């Protein structure tokens, strides 16, 4: 199974704080609640292109 790295960006400030490895079979974007160091709180992070 092939995989690739993608970035997760904060929906509030737009900073790209995290990178994750996903399989190429995944069609929908990943949305996860994570801690943003710039905002100082937990916010929703979404997969960027």
From Swiss-Prot:
Biological process per Gene Ontology, one example term: translation
Organism: Leuconostoc mesenteroides subsp. mesenteroides (strain ATCC 8293 / DSM 20343 / BCRC 11652 / CCM 1803 / JCM 6124 / NCDO 523 / NBRC 100496 / NCIMB 8023 / NCTC 12954 / NRRL B-1118 / 37Y)
Keyword tags: Ribonucleoprotein, Ribosomal protein
Protein name as annotated: Large ribosomal subunit protein bL33A
GO cellular component: cytoplasm; ribonucleoprotein complex; ribosome
GO molecular function terms listed in the Swiss-Prot or TrEMBL record: structural constituent of ribosome
Family according to the record: Belongs to the bacterial ribosomal protein bL33 family.
Disulfide-linked positions: none
Pfam families according to UniProt: Ribosomal_L33
């Amino acid at each position: 199974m092939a995989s690739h790295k993608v970035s997760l960006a904060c929906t509030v400030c737009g900073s790209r704080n995290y990178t994750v490895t996903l399989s190429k079979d995944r069609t929908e974007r990943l949305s996860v609640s994570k801690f943003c160091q710039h905002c100082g709180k937990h916010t929703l992070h979404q997969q960027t292109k």
